[in-house]
């Protein structure tokens, strides 16, 4: 499936800004269709739950839209900073290029949201291919 690059960019901006109302509207724009395709509805739901912090939903969305792509998390504590500053880093990488070139690297205190942003960035990158 191909996605509209501008709609994805708008969605990513709403996620990064933490704009709940804007996110819901942009999420429907990206993952809804007039015929209400069930697969797209599930993607919209997974995206919404990942935005709210569900790692299961982030993983399900990743599998649905980036089948065959790699992913992983790293923990960063930031140069001796206290643990409360810990950030999870979500990596999303192209198939067959796991160590060579990751497409998206996102740091966020909310690992599900980091994974969601990394997934959206990867979809945006696919629009340019």
Predicted feature residues:
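Glycine-rich anion-binding surface patch
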Residues: 1-113, 117, 121-129
């Amino acid at each position: 499936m191909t996605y509209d690059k501008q709609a994805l960019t708008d969605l990513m901006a709403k996620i990064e800004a933490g704009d709940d109302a804007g996110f819901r509207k942009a999420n429907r724009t990206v993952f809804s269709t007039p015929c209400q395709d069930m697969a797209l509805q599930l993607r919209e739901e997974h995206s919404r739950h990942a935005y709210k912090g569900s790692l299961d939903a982030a993983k399900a969305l990743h599998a649905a839209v980036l089948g065959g792509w790699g992913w992983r998390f790293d923990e960063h504590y930031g140069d001796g900073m206290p643990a409360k500053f810990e950030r999870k880093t979500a990596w999303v990488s192209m198939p067959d290029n796991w160590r060579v070139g990751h497409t998206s690297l996102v740091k966020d205190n909310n690992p599900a949201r980091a994974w969601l942003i990394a997934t959206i960035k990867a979809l945006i990158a696919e629009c340019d291919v």
